[in-house]
Amino acid sequence: MIVPVRCFTCGKVIGDKYYEFKRRVEAGEDPEKVLDDLGLERYCCRRMLLSHVELIDDIMHYRVY
């Protein structure tokens, strides 16, 4: 839903890297190389970016009571 600020497993800050990752992957770069360039070497941090699904724009259409 919302981009996680920290890795759920190890606690490393990853929120600042998400939009760079997303931009470069959408431009056609290999996700493995992008994650390496961003300094994400642990598989727990890598999965946080690889498995993230952006749903906040879809959910914002509904009212909260």
UniProtKB/Swiss-Prot annotation:
Q: What is the catalytic activity of this protein?
A: RNA(n) + a ribonucleoside 5'-triphosphate = RNA(n+1) + diphosphate
GO BP terms in the entry: DNA-templated transcription
Q: Mainly localized where? A: cytoplasm
Q: Where in the cell is it found?
A: Cytoplasm
Cofactor(s) for this protein? Zn(2+)
The UniProt annotation places Zn(2+) binding at: C7, C10, C44, C45
Relate the assembly described in the record: Part of the RNA polymerase complex.
> What protein name is recorded for this chain?
DNA-directed RNA polymerase subunit Rpo10
In its UniProt entry, the species of origin is given as Pyrococcus furiosus (strain ATCC 43587 / DSM 3638 / JCM 8422 / Vc1)
Gene assigned in the entry: rpo10
